């Protein structure tokens, strides 16, 4: 008889809840294990079958570690601020708070139905004032350290998103917003910015301290984009102005025949001649509607306008024209580049189009044929002539420094983090702007600054957030009658998720972010599992905040997440990404109802390697359920009683396969190879079906190994095997090294190379002993009688060949 998943799952989930089975144990004598999932945004759609894949992986690790004697921290919470709730509220007139609370309730119900061993007493919610008090507190520490500042900056302005809001560079894809696909324009606006660039080197170098996939480390390094080169200063002719250029190729300075500066560069208006003014203004207007990606597309036609101004190349005194072009971004480097058209494809196209001189500085090739990529000896370069590239770079940097016209410099692709958002549904920034120009933080003892309730959360229309509409909240007066306005922008969704793993350690503490001793006890996170889509942003921001808190002495570790694993994507059965529009979304509620939570957990772990994307298959789901039924029937009869072939004695027939299974499953779990661990348990179950008697101790071991993957069934089987109190803290099975291989082997006996008999002997028996047994074998004696044994060839554990004549 098959097991009844509905009854069993409800029974054991109730048991875990009543007994607080998974409440985190604080025990100084136990080693710790902190297993963390990337907490979800509680959307209106609810959980999809992709979520449980990562959650099951961390749950397997957590359950195994408890059984191995670890104290385990395995929490869950909600990344609940965010755009969809605000968009929903604007459409329906409902409060995003109510919408979010309802979604959380649904998510929690779904997650609990899957039997994950979370400590729900540590649940966090980023929209809870008791939580975001500490998000605001971290902002205040950043401000005090000079890492949060206000600046008018060119931002990505999406006028059609939420009635107008700023989006981060990372949220712009192909010139449109990642969410909704709305066009993005560049617009100057005063913003709060976090100085993540101050930590750029540490964010690269400390990747050596963590066990992360190489691909993710590489993505982070590329995003930060550290490059070593030189700053070079070009004097503007007939002016006291200087244009600073960063270049990774100072060896090519003699070949610089023009400068290009960004249309937004501070000097554009100051150096443009009256004759060029109209053309420059017109060009600047045209560029304002283009995204950074469009502007830097290598395939697009090069455009630009001559400013009328000239600069002086410091190394040879030559006068070179200064152009503006959209391919130079104000936000990268100095917003100005020296163009060496003979050796750079983009500069070559530009110079060719606008008929600007080209000077080759490396020998080899012909400019008529296109840009020169040869790097032979230097030519046309004065004191650098004849040098190789690296010598020329070093020599030129020394020359620049000696003459006071440049210096060695490290540049980064990473920009400071535009932190403010023109939205309602986010953490208020705890700042007041006073009428006399002073900006102050809200005193720490007045935190949290609560997000006010509002019925109308449409954008203000001025570029400010909807909070600007709430006069009673915005306008303040201090004790001296000085008037001020609260900051009306809110924090991005990244804020609450940049430190949540710290709050799980001590979620109810109202005096500090978390107790120092508890942070020392639990950090770093031992295992962090989530989607690769967060490879750059969330992980970079969380690491940045963690390093700031480390410098403040708040956290004890340099890095927050020791091991990172990215689960693959579960695709639709048609091998496409699941989406409502394609009609291939699978709802876990339906699977739990029809097959049971354990089946879903088993199937998602058996589909393939955790880190690879795999297509959903109804057949695979059926197969997983059938195998659970097979395990059940191995031990339980139709009367729901333990089968009588489960006995206390052990005849030894399953010794080797059992010990091999314990070893492989343990190793595979530790290395998160769950699919091969399941395969090994299938092999063991097949062997167990062939055995006449099943040692109870081996059946208990099997159930313990199954418990992390199919915990409800395992609890029921454990109970039927005669145990009380649940399986969660039962001791993890161990294996006997001596039983991993057969104790005996079968040896083939040959006479003159022909097989005449076989004998079973102890493995690794001495050669002399094996020879004696072979010669004494009755069948062999029939072939050797009356013959002379000339030679005996012994291959241990395999063959004895007797040569007779």
Curated annotation (Swiss-Prot):
Single GO BP term: leucyl-tRNA aminoacylation
Motif ('KMSKS' region): 577-581
Gene Ontology cellular-component terms listed: cytosol
Entry keyword Nucleotide-binding: yes
Signal sequence, start to end: none
Catalytic reaction list: tRNA(Leu) + L-leucine + ATP = L-leucyl-tRNA(Leu) + AMP + diphosphate
Location(s) in or outside the cell: Cytoplasm
Main location: cytoplasm
Binding-site residues, ATP: 580
Motif segment ('HIGH' region): 40-51
UniProt KW Metal-binding keyword: no
Keyword vocabulary terms for this entry: Aminoacyl-tRNA synthetase, ATP-binding, Cytoplasm, Ligase, Nucleotide-binding, Protein biosynthesis
GO molecular function: aminoacyl-tRNA deacylase activity; ATP binding; leucine-tRNA ligase activity
UniProt-listed PANTHER family: LEUCINE--TRNA LIGASE, MITOCHONDRIAL, LEUCYL-TRNA SYNTHETASE
Name of the protein described by the UniProt record: Leucine--tRNA ligase
Organism: Pediococcus pentosaceus (strain ATCC 25745 / CCUG 21536 / LMG 10740 / 183-1w)
Underlying gene: leuS
């Amino acid at each position: 008889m098959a097991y009844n998943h509905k009854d069993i799952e409800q029974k054991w989930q109730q048991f875990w809840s009543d007994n607080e089975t998974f409440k985190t144990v604080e025990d100084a004598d136990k080693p710790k294990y902190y297993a963390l999932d990337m907490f979800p945004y509680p959307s209106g759609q609810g959980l999809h079958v992709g979520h449980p894949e990562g959650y099951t992986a961390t749950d397997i690790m957590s359950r195994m570690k408890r059984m191995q004697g670890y104290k385990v921290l395995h929490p869950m919470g909600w990344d609940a601020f965010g755009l969809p709730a605000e968009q929903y509220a604007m459409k329906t007139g409902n409060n995003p708070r109510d919408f979010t609370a309802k979604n959380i309730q649904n998510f929690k119900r779904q997650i609990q139905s899957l039997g994950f061993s979370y400590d729900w007493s540590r649940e966090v919610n980023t929209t809870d004032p008791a939580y975001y008090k500490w998000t605001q507190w971290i902002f205040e520490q950043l401000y005090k350290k000079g890492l949060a500042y206000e600046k008018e900056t060119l931002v990505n302005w999406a006028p059609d998103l939420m009635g107008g809001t700023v989006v981060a560079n990372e949220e712009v894809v192909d010139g449109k917003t990642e969410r909704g696909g709305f066009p993005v324009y560049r617009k100057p606006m005063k913003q709060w910015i976090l100085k993540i660039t101050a930590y750029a080197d540490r964010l690269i170098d400390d990747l050596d301290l963590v066990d992360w996939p190489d691909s993710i480390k590489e993505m982070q390094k590329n995003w930060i984009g550290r490059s070593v080169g030189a700053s070079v200063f070009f004097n503007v002719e007939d002016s006291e102005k200087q244009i600073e250029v960063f270049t990774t190729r100072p060896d090519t300075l003699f070949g610089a025949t023009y400068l290009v500066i960004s249309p937004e560069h501070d000097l554009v208006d100051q150096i443009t001649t009256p004759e060029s003014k109209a053309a420059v203004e017109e060009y600047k207007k045209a560029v304002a509607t283009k995204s950074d990606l469009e502007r830097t597309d290598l395939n697009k036609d090069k455009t630009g306008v001559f400013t009328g101004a000239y600069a002086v190349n410091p190394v040879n005194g030559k006068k070179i024209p200064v152009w503006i072009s959209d391919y130079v971004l104000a936000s990268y480097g100095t917003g100005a580049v020296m163009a060496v058209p003979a050796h750079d494809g983009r500069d070559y196209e530009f110079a060719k189009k606008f008929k600007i001189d080209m000077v080759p500085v490396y020998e080899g090739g012909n400019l008529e044929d296109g840009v020169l990529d040869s790097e032979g000896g230097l030519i046309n370069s004065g004191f650098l002539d004849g040098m190789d590239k690296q010598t020329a770079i070093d020599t030129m940097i020394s020359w620049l420094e000696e003459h006071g016209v440049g210096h060695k410099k490290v540049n980064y692709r990473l920009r400071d983090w535009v932190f403010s958002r023109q939205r309602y549904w986010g953490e208020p920034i705890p700042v007041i702007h006073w009428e006399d120009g002073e900006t102050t933080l809200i005193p720490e003892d007045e935190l949290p600054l609560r997000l006010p309730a509002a019925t109308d959360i449409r954008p203000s229309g001025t570029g400010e957030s909807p909070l600007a509409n709430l006069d009673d909240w915005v306008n303040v007066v201090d004790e001296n009658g000085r008037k001020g306005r609260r900051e009306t922008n809110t924090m991005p969704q990244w804020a609450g998720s940049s430190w949540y793993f710290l709050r799980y350690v001590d979620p109810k503490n109202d005096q500090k972010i978390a107790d120092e001793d508890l942070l020392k006890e639990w950090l770093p996170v031992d295992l962090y599992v989530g989607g690769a889509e967060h490879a750059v942003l969330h992980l970079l921001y969380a690491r940045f905040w963690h390093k700031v808190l480390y410098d403040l002495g708040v956290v004890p570790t340099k890095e927050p997440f020791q091991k990172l694993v990215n689960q693959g994507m579960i695709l639709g059965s048609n091998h496409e990404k699941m989406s409502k529009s394609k009609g291939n979304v699978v709802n876990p509620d339906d699977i739990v109802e029809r097959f049971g939570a354990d089946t879903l957990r088993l199937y998602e772990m058996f589909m393939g390697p955790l880190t690879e994307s795999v297509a959903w298959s109804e057949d695979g789901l059926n197969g997983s359920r059938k195998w659970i039924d097979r395990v059940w029937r191995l031990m339980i009869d139709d009367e729901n009683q333990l089968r009588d072939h489960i006995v206390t004695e052990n005849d030894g027939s399953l010794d080797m396969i059992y010990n091999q299974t314990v070893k492989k499953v343990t190793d595979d779990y530790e290395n998160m190879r769950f699919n091969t661990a399941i395969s090994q348990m299938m092999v063991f179950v097949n062997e167990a079906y062939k055995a006449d008697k099943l040692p109870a101790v081996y059946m208990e071991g099997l159930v313990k190994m199954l418990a992390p993957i199919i915990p409800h069934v395992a609890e029921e089987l454990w109970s039927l095997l005669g145990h009380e109190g649940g399986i969660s803290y039962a001791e993890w099975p161990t294996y006997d090294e001596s039983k991993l291989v057969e104790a005996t082997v079968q040896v083939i006996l040959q006479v003159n190379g022909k097989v005449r008999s076989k004998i079973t002997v102890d493995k690794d028996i001495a050669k002399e002993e094996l020879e004696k047994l072979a010669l004494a074998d009755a069948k062999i004696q029939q072939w050797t009688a009356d013959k002379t044994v000339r030679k005996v060839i012994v291959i241990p554990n395999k063959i004895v060949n007797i040569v007779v004549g």
